[in-house]
Design a protein with these regions (language model features):
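Hydrophobic alpha-helical core bundles mediating ligand binding, dimerization, or RNAP-core interactions
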Residues: 36-44, 64, 68, 127
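Generic structural signal for well-ordered secondary structure
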Residues: 29, 57-60, 77
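Conserved GNAT-fold acetyl-CoA-binding loop/helix
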Residues: 45-69
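Acyl-donor (CoA/ACP) binding surface of acyl/acetyltransferases
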Residues: 1-39, 81, 85-197
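Short, P/G- and charge-enriched loop/turn segments at secondary-structure junctions
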Residues: 13, 68-73
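Short loop/turn motifs at secondary-structure junctions and domain boundaries
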Residues: 72-77, 164
Length: 197
């Protein structure tokens, strides 16, 4: 997560660029961080870590004080992250970062920390909203991408439900617990996305 924060770069202010009604997503505030901390670090090995790039082995359980003093705090409060809200409570986040800002290559991600809410259509709605926000915030970009791995079939299905195209499958480059998995890249172009709406 910290590596992701370092790659982000500057983004324009979300609130001034996106004026449409937001249904599922909201900007995180300082007062939301203890709630988010509980969601993320509720156990030594939460279920979401099994699917969110576990081959990087980056998850470390942090106490609240350490979390609030870490770079993760800045990451979650940045314009590159919005909270996913369901029934008035935070359940996850959507993120974005520049793979290469010079070539206008933007990538997005999503984590729903509460696994009891997986496969309820919430992720689909949240990412659809987020893609729209990204295209509106950056009128110069023509594509939004998402990278996952073959060990996360739920994310693959979600990407396809959103109308994203599988643009690349880099075979056997994610070695995890004795098994090789593929890295899978999805993308959707601006005109494709707005044609679906």
């Amino acid at each position: 997560m910290i590596q992701l924060f370092r790659r982000i770069g500057a983004f324009n202010n979300l609130n001034t660029l996106y004026k449409e009604k937001v249904n599922l997503l909201k900007k995180l505030r300082e007062t939301d961080l203890p709630i988010l901390h509980t969601l993320i670090y509720s156990s030594e090995k939460p279920r979401w870590t099994l699917y969110n790039a576990p081959y990087f082995d980056e998850y470390k359980q942090l106490n609240l004080e350490t979390f609030l003093q870490s770079e993760n705090r800045l990451f979650f409060l940045s314009e590159n992250v919005l909270a996913i809200v369901h029934e008035e409570r935070i359940i996850g986040v959507v993120t974005r970062y520049w793979e290469d800002i010079r070539t206008r290559w933007l990538e997005i991600g999503i984590v729903i920390y509460d696994d009891s809410l997986w496969s309820h259509g919430i992720g689909t709605s949240a990412l659809q909203e987020w893609i729209g926000i990204c295209f509106k915030a950056f009128p110069e970009i023509e594509r939004v991408g998402l990278t996952t791995w073959s060990g996360n079939p739920g994310m693959m299905r979600l990407s396809e439900k959103l109308g994203m195209t599988q643009e690349a499958r880099i075979r056997k480059v994610r070695y995890y617990k004795g098994t090789y998995y593929d890295s899978i890249k999805y993308g959707i172009l601006r005109d494709e996305f707005f044609a679906l709406k």
